[in-house]
Amino acid sequence: MSFRIEKELTTHPLGKLGLPGNSLDKLQLLCDARTMRELDRNAIENIGIPGMVLMENAARSFTDLLEQEILSKNPDQLVVVCCGKGNNGGDGFASARQLANRNYRVTVVHAGEAKTEDAFKNQQIWEQFGESVSFPSSDA
């Protein structure tokens, strides 16, 4: 099975954040969420790449970019990682762990218990490292 990513590129909304000295304004959307889910599913089911490997690779790429574009200029900055309940939350826990391993100050705010096995595993790994997870109050 092959996938075609549309050539039409759209400027990503993150580029409008205006963070000083970064290249997020150059970030472009290459595919939509539905296409990305299909690519992930294909990698897992047809190629045999475990979901945890995909999460780890995504987290490493994000962590490298964050370090290069923002944290290298302000290494003492607290990084707050907001994790949802799905696989993006799992990516967040993996990114938080990688940032902590690189000696950055990190805290995680999580929407609740993970709904997927891989996301839950990354949450457990984060907690086994002795790190805490903040759950926002329902009153917020």
Each predicted region: which residue ranges?
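Intrinsically disordered, low-complexity polar regions and short flexible loop motifs
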Residues: 43-46
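Active-site-adjacent bridging/hinge elements
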Residues: 32-38
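Residues within alpha-helical segments
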Residues: 41, 59-64, 97
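A glycine-rich, Thr/Ser-enriched phosphate-binding loop motif common to dinucleotide/cofactor-binding enzymes
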Residues: 49-63
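Generic structural signal for well-ordered alpha-helical scaffold segments
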Residues: 63-71
